[in-house]
Amino acid sequence: MKTLIVEDNPKKRASLVEYYSSEFPSDDLEVTSALISGLRVARDTKPEFIILDMTLPNYSPDENKGSRIELMPFAGREFVMRVNRMSIKTKVIIVSMFETFGVAPRLITLNSLDAELRDRYPNVFVEAVHYSQAQADWKTAIKNARLSLDR
């Protein structure tokens, strides 16, 4: 199965890749670190499963040409919307280190975001889960989402 991981934090990215590769060693895994490169890879390779961070830069450092890297708090929402528009037959799970996004008065929780994306994009979006090295909830969520694609 083709899988795409879009994550900009090197330690979290390594953790996601290590876990996913150990659970699903026969899957074809692509990894990117920014919104635009992730969308390009999704368009070109049509992955069946996408593990996505919520807060991402628009461009990766090598694409940014020396400009300041600005994080977009709702990049994951944008990604899901665009993948849905591209009609890619995929399932997306968001794995985020943050539990709130944006700034007041537009602050939104991970749970609210999860409900919004499930409602708006039921054919693409699976769930949003909190990432923590100390807890295994994110591992269980990834494993369950991936295994559901085999049914």
Curated annotation (Swiss-Prot):
Record's protein name: Uncharacterized protein y4jR
Keyword Phosphoprotein in record: yes
InterPro entries: CheY-like_superfamily, Sig_transdc_resp-reg_receiver
Residues with the 4-aspartylphosphate modification: D53
GO biological process: phosphorelay signal transduction system
Organism domain of life: Bacteria
Signal sequence, renumbered to the chain: none
PROSITE patterns: RESPONSE_REGULATORY
Keywords: Phosphoprotein, Plasmid, Two-component regulatory system
Domain Response regulatory: 2-133
Organism: Sinorhizobium fredii (strain NBRC 101917 / NGR234)
